[in-house]
């Protein structure tokens, strides 16, 4: 695919699609709650569609209305054995959260995915779930997919310290614990996104959170709800970056989720000197309208407990760093190596081929700016965030063409990405 280059300015207002993390969880909790759940603003990207289809295969009635998704919840005990293996597509969230949920059922199921997902480690969930008494088996030492889950209704509670900062692992344990007699305690290494904890309470469940410790007693019953999904900050990140680095740009992004466990990017933008302002802040539903303008940026260090709060935004932050004066250091981000692709290597390869002064390290990157970018032939590596980062980088290119292979990966989380780019384009 040939990407747009030589952007003069991006201007306008935009509503980004619904939050991917929250959309997954809304579907999951709607399916296991009792009664009807109505979801407005759901992301209809390929990852979330994989979660929806999985629950249909598990006997849950899910249908669309004009502007919402309606789920006829079956409760924890109402799921039915799937007649075939469940296809998770490219979605690590789907596989890990469903593994936790299905570990406590009374039937077995196989979860599989595409080539990218089949290279992602599942031992991080099989270890704690096995300690609870579940039987899960993958391929090799890292328990790579396909993953066989042999349900066990007699799971036992555990006290577990997460070895990695992972909301997916935490969520898998919580979904199993909701069906387990007794109290399960999870101690996080670093605070991670808390959408699962919030949704448990939203659906009438109970848990307690004290700093990095989460305690939950099971079994519990959940009740169907009506939900409004906020816009995805991880999708908004690409437009925020474009507004900051394309000269003459001025963008307003409406209804963006600003859950504090996800707003590391906004803090980084401010530290780099970006012109960012908040409008129409709604603290109850944690959304805001964000306004950005072209800015002179400076290099900074990004590390420590900030990393889990912006892990998905690090590719586009690396792009920002190529246009910042000075050196940016990204550290403690080794988790990037086990995403849809090795994002440290992919970001370094793509931006390096386009002329950036960027170096991969074991746990991050070193980027020296400011550098002009030029045309190149690159690939998404099957990773939606690499694809969108490249499309924004291409806007700065004045010489040569940028061609992007496997651009369809962007459909994973942002089906209308290129349509929205055209809406904001100003000659």
Curated annotation (Swiss-Prot):
Q: Would you tell me the Gene Ontology cellular component terms?
A: cytoplasm
Where, by residue number, does 3-phosphoshikimate bind? 20-21, 25, 166, 168, 312, 339
Q: Which reaction does it catalyse?
A: 3-phosphoshikimate + phosphoenolpyruvate = 5-O-(1-carboxyvinyl)-3-phosphoshikimate + phosphate
Binding residue positions for phosphoenolpyruvate: 20, 92, 120, 168, 343, 385
Where does it localize?
A: Cytoplasm
Q: Which Pfam families has this protein been placed in?
A: EPSP_synthase (PF00275)
Q: List the InterPro entries hit by this protein, alphabetically.
A: Enolpyruvate_Tfrase_dom, Enolpyruvate_Tfrase_sf, EPSP_synthase, EPSP_synthase_CS, RNA3'P_cycl/enolpyr_Trfase_a/b
- Pathway involvement? Metabolic intermediate biosynthesis; chorismate biosynthesis; chorismate from D-erythrose 4-phosphate and phosphoenolpyruvate: step 6/7
Which residues catalyse the reaction?
A: 312
Keywords of the record, alphabetical order, are: Amino-acid biosynthesis, Aromatic amino acid biosynthesis, Cytoplasm, Transferase
| The keyword Cytoplasm is annotated on this UniProt entry | yes
> Which GO biological process entries does UniProt record here?
amino acid biosynthetic process; aromatic amino acid family biosynthetic process; chorismate biosynthetic process
The record's GO molecular-function terms, alphabetically, read: 3-phosphoshikimate 1-carboxyvinyltransferase activity
Q: What is its EC number?
A: 2.5.1.19
Q: What does this protein do?
A: Catalyzes the transfer of the enolpyruvyl moiety of phosphoenolpyruvate (PEP) to the 5-hydroxyl of shikimate-3-phosphate (S3P) to produce enolpyruvyl shikimate-3-phosphate and inorganic phosphate.
Describe the protein's quaternary organization and the partners it interacts with: Monomer.
Q: Which family does it belong to?
A: Belongs to the EPSP synthase family.
Protein name per UniProt: 3-phosphoshikimate 1-carboxyvinyltransferase
Give the species this sequence originates from: Streptococcus equi subsp. zooepidemicus (strain MGCS10565)
Gene for this chain: aroA
């Amino acid at each position: 695919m040939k990407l747009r280059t030589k952007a003069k300015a991006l201007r306008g207002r935009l509503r980004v699609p619904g939050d991917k993390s929250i959309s997954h969880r809304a579907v999951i909790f709607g399916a296991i709650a009792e009664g009807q759940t109505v979801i407005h603003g759901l992301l209809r990207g390929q990852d979330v569609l994989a979660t929806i289809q999985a629950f249909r295969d598990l006997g849950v009635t899910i249908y669309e209305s004009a502007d919402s998704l309606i789920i006829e919840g079956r409760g924890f005990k109402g799921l039915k054995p799937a007649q075939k293996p469940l296809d998770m597509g490219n979605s690590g969230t789907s596989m890990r959260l469903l593994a936790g949920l299905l570990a406590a059922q009374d039937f077995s199921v196989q979860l599989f995915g595409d080539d990218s997902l089949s290279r992602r480690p599942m031992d991080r969930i099989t270890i704690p779930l096995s300690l609870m008494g579940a039987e899960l088996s993958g391929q090799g030492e890292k328990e790579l997919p396909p993953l066989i889950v042999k349900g066990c209704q007699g799971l036992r509670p555990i006290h577990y310290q997460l070895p990695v900062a992972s909301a997916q692992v935490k969520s898998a344990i919580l979904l199993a614990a909701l069906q387990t007699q007794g109290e399960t305690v999870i101690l996080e290494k670093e605070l991670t996104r808390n959408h699962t904890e919030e949704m448990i309470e939203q659906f009438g469940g109970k848990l307690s959170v004290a700093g990095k410790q989460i305690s939950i007693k099971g079994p519990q019953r959940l009740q169907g709800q009506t939900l409004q999904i906020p816009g995805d900050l991880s999708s908004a990140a690409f437009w925020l970056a474009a507004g900051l680095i394309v000269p003459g740009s001025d963008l307003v992004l409406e209804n963006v989720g600003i859950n504090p466990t996800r707003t590391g990017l906004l803090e980084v933008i401010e530290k780099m000197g970006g012109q960012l302002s908040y409008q129409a802040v709604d603290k109850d539903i944690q959304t805001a309208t964000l306004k950005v303008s072209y800015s002179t940026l400076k290099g900074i260090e990004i590390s420590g407990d900030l990393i889990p709060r912006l892990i998905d935004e690090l590719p586009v932050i690396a792009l920002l760093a190529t246009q910042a004066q000075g050196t940016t250091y990204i550290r403690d981000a080794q988790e990037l190596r086990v995403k849809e692709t090795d994002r440290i290597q992919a970001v370094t390869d793509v931006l390096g081929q386009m002329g950036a002064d960027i170096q991969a390290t074991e746990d991050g990157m070193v980027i020296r700016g400011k550098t002009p970018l030029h045309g190149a032939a690159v690939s998404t590596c099957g990773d939606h965030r690499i694809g969108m980062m490249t499309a924004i980088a291409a806007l700065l290119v004045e010489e040569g063409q940028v061609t992007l292979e496997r651009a369809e990966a962007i459909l994973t989380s942002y089906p209308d990405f290129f349509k929205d780019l055209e809406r904001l384009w100003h000659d």
